[in-house]
Amino acid sequence: MSLSDIFCVNRHREDFFKLLKNDLNILIGNENEINELMQKKNLLDSMNELKSIDKLIIITRSENGSVAILNNVITYCESVNVKKVVDLTGAGDLFASGFFKEYLDNFDIKKCLQTGSELSAKIIKKIGARLN
């Protein structure tokens, strides 16, 4: 499940937690959404609390890369350097598509994060959310 935006997280925090603990296997969100969900001021505090939940948590961090938490292990991935960002539309969606493509092909989490970062870097170099 994707957290969508911080306002949605704020309105439905209790429901998100119930889903996360009982029904979901995978949660994806950006740093702000995760901090809002966990009601923490910084990502490290949020991640430390999320490590105890036995789910795959994926956190995008814009130019600061991405993070995955699984089985009490935190995996970091640097972002792909983009000289000029043109439009952020579609960056999260392309990250997720790259991540899940590799995940479904049974690649390790680091490779999944890298592919997500590569695709999101491609889309932010142009206007719009289509690669072609």
Question: What are the residue ranges of the model-derived segments?
Answer:
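Conserved beta-alpha-beta core of the PfkB/ribokinase-like small-molecule kinase fold
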Residues: M1-M47, N64-G65
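Conserved phosphate-binding/catalytic region of the ribokinase-like
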Residues: E14, K40-N132
